[in-house]
């Protein structure tokens, strides 16, 4: 009986050792997987925060763009209305100018007949084109400065 007891004891010890090894192996795997899960959860949280921040910035940039695009469109519309009013004669374009006097032989001496000051049509078009480009440049510059101050901090 002692031999049977020794074999059974050896088998029980082998089973206990094998079970201990298996438990230790699966415990190590559980610890490793838990660490990986925690690391991935932190990375996911950071990624979600970055996505939220980017979406907020995109909304801010879109609002900023819409604001300055509207201001630019309003300024261009105002410039076009001014151009149309000047062309139709409802408004006058005042520019400091000096008119050359025209002397007529039949007029009394010392009296000058001055010609009415007026821009040439090309100069008038150039004025409004320049004004429109200045407005565009100003609005683009304001929008860029606002973008840099708000988004590139």
From Swiss-Prot:
One of its GO terms (cellular component) is host cell plasma membrane. Keywords: Coiled coil, Cytolysis, Disulfide bond, Host cell inner membrane, Host cell lysis by virus, Host cell membrane, Host membrane, Membrane, Signal-anchor, Transmembrane, Transmembrane helix, Viral release from host cell. It is a single-pass type II membrane protein. One of its GO terms (biological process) is viral release via disruption of host outer membrane. The keyword Transmembrane helix applies. It is found in: Host cell inner membrane. Residues 65-92 form a coiled coil. The chain crosses the membrane at residues 4-24. Belongs to the Lambdavirus i-spanin family. The coiled coil region is probably involved in host membrane fusion leading to lysis. Component of the spanin complex that disrupts the host outer membrane and participates in cell lysis during virus exit. The spanin complex conducts the final step in host lysis by disrupting the outer membrane after holin and endolysin have permeabilized the inner membrane and degraded the host peptidoglycans. Host outer membrane disruption is due to local fusion between the inner and outer membrane performed by the spanin complex. This is Spanin, inner membrane subunit. The gene is Rz.
């Amino acid at each position: 009986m002692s031999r049977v007891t020794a074999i059974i004891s050896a088998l029980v010890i082998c089973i206990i050792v094998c079970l201990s090894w298996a438990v230790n192996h699966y415990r190590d795997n559980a610890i490793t997987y838990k660490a990986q899960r925690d690391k991935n959860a932190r990375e996911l949280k950071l990624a979600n925060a970055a996505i939220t921040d980017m979406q907020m910035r995109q909304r801010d940039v879109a609002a900023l763009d819409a604001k300055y695009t509207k201001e630019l469109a309003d300024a261009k519309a105002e410039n076009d209305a001014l151009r149309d009013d000047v062309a139709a004669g409802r408004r006058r374009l005042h520019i400091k100018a000096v008119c050359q006097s025209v002397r007529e032989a039949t007029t009394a001496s010392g009296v000058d007949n001055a010609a009415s000051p007026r821009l040439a049509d090309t100069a008038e078009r150039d004025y409004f084109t320049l004004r429109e480009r200045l407005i565009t440049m100003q609005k683009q510059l304001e929008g860029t400065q606002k973008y840099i101050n708000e988004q590139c901090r």
